[in-house]
């Protein structure tokens, strides 16, 4: 009997979804997932209230064959009985593409959610786990297998139900796209219903793994190979594809890793390659040697797995392999960056995953001797009121610190300095040691003192050193402008002939602080963090560096400059009294800026002011930084999170804050002002820092306290102004350190509205 007619019982765990689309402005969805197998087996998860990142972790057992199609749809329970059913996305999987039922195994998959036939907007990913059970294989008659696929997807009207059901449904309303398209045997000859082929098959049969059939605008059929990201007019066959895949595995294993990351929506190219060469027990190997402490072994069936002797754990995932995930942000949760990380990564040190007697996954933290249903690598679902930024940063930080590259090496790294010469001594000590030595346990000793470093000395060391090395006196860094206190690289640091060596040293110091989980007492302009993350700088980044110059560039874009400005594609740089003209493009000083090319001029001058003129210094800094912190790991964070990772959250003096706060249309004795300060006393230090970041643009407090807060036009105290309607959220004006606070009628309403504004706001919309 053919393998496609053999049925086996597997476990499908719907773990979580991440970054779902928010269709309502003021309300979050209540997501639940519906699992359907070949249109006849249906299971439903419970609904998770008010979240875009639901965590279900529910397991269902289903009978499948290699040709079975698993459809998982996500809906909003609030809208399930309305038109559209609150559809949030769907994925379709062919079992044989991701799991070999004959061998068995366990696969954790992350898939992009897809649109339905109605083409509604969909965002986000879903994480599922497929695993075989020890039960014996069931034989399913061919006729039954064929007939089962003529049924349509069934969904119960009660989303809370977890019972299997099979109810006929109109195909036109199916939200799974075509869950019944599949690789089933052809319909009975007696049936006159025409056969509809999916994009992965045609009249000659199913395409090889990783291939897709498409039609151009002239109706011609062509084929897409997602494994190699190429197209052809010639229909592929299994033998030629298997041979090419095997050759590629031997010649360029790393290219499979890149393909796997670039096409996450194409059912994972590397897994398809694995399926095509399964008969030879080949696997998609990572490039290079295994990390220290890792070993590759094989199961009795010949499947490779990997042993981490550092943490005494095993995994199916090759530690040399990376996959790409997207970061979401900005308007409409749009994709803003792709970052290479593992799908979930290993569990943090001291954690263990176990199963209950009902096969539900739970996690044991041996560090605190506690258990939880929540995967520590995912956002916490214990409290759905936890703000999104906190769940994301917590998840990223746990992943970041759990990576082998961030684990201290055996041994100790001794650094001895004099307090009065901490900059010079640190430069000599840190630059004489190799990057490997700096990854050992850090032991700081101050000359003439008997203290032992169990954390306190190294924290004080980084605090004192950061005050010295970022001092503008050394000409390495400067304040972003005369009206701010954040730092930027001094473009004229070349007055110090050793400046590039010092920038490499500073890169090592910041990398050292992150590696050993310490903070430096300095905050930089946003563009500096973006350059570390290798993100593109924009005109908006100019505002934190030079607000006046930023407004001038915005004026150029917003107004007709014909006959008004006499500009060329060049800039003048004043270097210690000497004015130098620099071309922004070849022969730029002779090219006039017009209404037609002014956008190009603004883009070029922005890149020059922020990036080009400090390129040499930053490259030296980045060389030292990357010796300790791998680029692919630091890219997990965004620029705001990186600011907290490097600088931490400073203590806030409430009395100093109150003393140096101004009021407009309010007075200190107004009830809402009293409520505001009561809330500040009640809020955590992290939340208060978030409010400062929301209002002033940074969570950093000046060294001399709130009295030194600066705005875009000079000294500006923290200001609370009466503005807006009571049903609106507060607004922030970061250039003027001003919070527009509507006259709310209760302390509870003030707390709620202010919390939403501070915690749920993503990106800049401030004036």
Swiss-Prot record:
Pathway(s) per entry: Protein modification; protein ubiquitination
Topology relative to the membrane: Peripheral membrane protein
Enzyme class: transferase
Keyword Lyase: no
Any one cellular-component term (Gene Ontology): Golgi apparatus
Keywords carried by this UniProt record: Cytoplasm, Membrane, Phosphoprotein, Repeat, Transferase, Ubl conjugation pathway
GO molecular function, one term: ubiquitin protein ligase activity
Additional notes on this entry: A cysteine residue is required for ubiquitin-thioester formation.
Biased segments, Polar residues type: 138-158, 257-286
Protein name: E3 ubiquitin-protein ligase pub1
WW domain segment(s): 211-236, 294-319, 351-376
Composition skew (Low complexity), residue ranges: 159-176, 184-194
Documented EC number(s): 2.3.2.26
Superkingdom classification of source: Eukaryota
UniProt feature coiled coil, ranges: none
Active-site residue numbers: 735 (glycyl thioester intermediate)
């Amino acid at each position: 009997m053919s393998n496609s007619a053999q049925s086996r019982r597997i476990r499908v765990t719907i773990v979580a979804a991440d970054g779902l689309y928010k269709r309502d402005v003021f309300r979050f969805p209540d997501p639940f997932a519906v699992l359907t197998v070949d249109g006849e087996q249906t299971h439903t998860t419970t609904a998770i209230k008010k979240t875009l990142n639901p965590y279900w972790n529910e397991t269902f057992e289903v009978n499948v064959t290699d040709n079975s199609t698993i459809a998982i749809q996500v809906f909003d329970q609030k809208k399930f009985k309305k038109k559209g059913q609150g559809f949030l996305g769907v994925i379709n999987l062919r079992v044989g593409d991701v799991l070999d039922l004959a061998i068995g195994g366990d696969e954790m998959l992350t898939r992009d959610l897809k649109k339905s036939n109605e083409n509604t907007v969909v965002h986000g990913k879903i994480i599922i786990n497929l695993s075989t059970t020890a039960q014996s294989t069931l034989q399913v008659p061919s006729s039954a297998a064929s007939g089962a696929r003529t049924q349509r997807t069934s969904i119960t009207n009660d989303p809370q139900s977890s019972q299997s059901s099979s109810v006929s449904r109109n195909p036109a309303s199916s939200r799974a796209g075509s869950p019944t398209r599949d690789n089933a045997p052809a319909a009975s000859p007696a049936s006159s219903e025409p056969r509809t082929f999916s994009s992965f098959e045609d009249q000659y049969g199913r395409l090889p793994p990783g291939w897709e059939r498409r039609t151009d605008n002239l109706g011609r059929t062509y084929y897409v190979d997602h494994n190699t990201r190429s197209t052809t007019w010639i229909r592929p066959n299994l033998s030629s594809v298997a041979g090419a895949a095997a050759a590629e595995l031997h010649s360029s294993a790393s290219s499979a890793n890149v393909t796997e990351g670039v096409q996450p929506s194409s059912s994972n190219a590397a897994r398809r390659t694995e399926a095509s060469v399964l008969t030879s027990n080949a696997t998609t190997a990572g490039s290079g040697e295994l990390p220290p402490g890792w070993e590759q072994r094989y199961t009795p069936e010949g499947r490779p797995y990997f042993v981490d002797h550092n943490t005494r754990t095993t995994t199916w995932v090759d530690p040399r392999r990376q996959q790409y995930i997207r970061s979401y942000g900005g308007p409409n949760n749009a994709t803003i960056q792709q970052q290479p990380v593992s799908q979930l990564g290993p569990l943090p040190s001291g954690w263990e995953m176990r199963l209950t007697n009902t096969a539900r996954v739970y996690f044991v933290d041996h560090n605190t001797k506690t258990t939880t249903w929540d995967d520590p690598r995912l956002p916490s679902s214990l409290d759905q009121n936890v703000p999104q930024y906190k769940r994301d940063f917590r998840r990223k930080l746990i992943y970041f610190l759990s990576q082998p590259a961030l684990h201290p090496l055996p041994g100790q790294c001794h650094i001895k300095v004099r307090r009065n010469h901490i900059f010079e001594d640190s430069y000599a000590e840190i630059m004489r040691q190799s990057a490997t030595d700096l990854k050992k346990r850090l032991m700081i000793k101050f000359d003439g003192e008997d203290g032992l470093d169990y954390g306190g000395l190294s924290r004080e060391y980084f605090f004192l050193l950061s005050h010295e090395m970022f001092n503008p006196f050394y000409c390495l860094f400067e304040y972003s402008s005369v009206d701010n206190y954040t730092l930027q690289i001094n473009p004229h640091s070349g007055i110090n002939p050793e400046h590039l060596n010092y920038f490499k040293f500073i890169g090592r110091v910041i990398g050292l602080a992150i590696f050993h989980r310490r903070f430096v007492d300095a905050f930089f302009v946003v563009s500096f963090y973006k350059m570390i993350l290798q993100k593109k700088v924009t005109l908006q980044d100019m505002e934190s560096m030079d607000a006046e110059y930023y407004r001038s560039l915005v004026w150029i874009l917003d107004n007709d400059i014909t006959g008004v400005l006499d500009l060329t594609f060049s800039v003048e740089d004043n270097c210690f009294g000497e004015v130098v003209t620099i071309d922004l493009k070849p022969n730029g000083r002779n090219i006039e800026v017009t209404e037609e090319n002014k956008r190009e001029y603004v883009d070029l001058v922005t890149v020059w002011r922020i990036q080009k003129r400090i390129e040499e210094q930053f490259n030296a800094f980045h060389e030292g930084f990357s010796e300790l912190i791998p680029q692919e790991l630091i890219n997990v964070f965004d620029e705001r999170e990186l600011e907290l990772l490097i600088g931490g959250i400073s203590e806030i003096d409430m009395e100093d804050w109150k003393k140096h706060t101004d009021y407009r249309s309010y007075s200190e004795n107004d009830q809402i002002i009293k409520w505001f300060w009561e809330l500040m006393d009640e809020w955590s230090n992290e939340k208060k820092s978030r409010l400062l970041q929301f209002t002033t643009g940074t969570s950093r407090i000046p060294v001399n306290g709130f009295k030194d807060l600066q705005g875009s036009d000079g000294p500006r105290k923290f200001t609370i102004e009466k503005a807006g309607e009571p049903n609106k959220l507060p607004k922030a004006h970061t250039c003027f350190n001003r919070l527009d606070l509507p006259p709310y009628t209760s302390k509870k309403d003030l707390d709620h509205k202010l919390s939403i504004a501070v915690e749920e706001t993503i990106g800049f919309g401030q004036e």
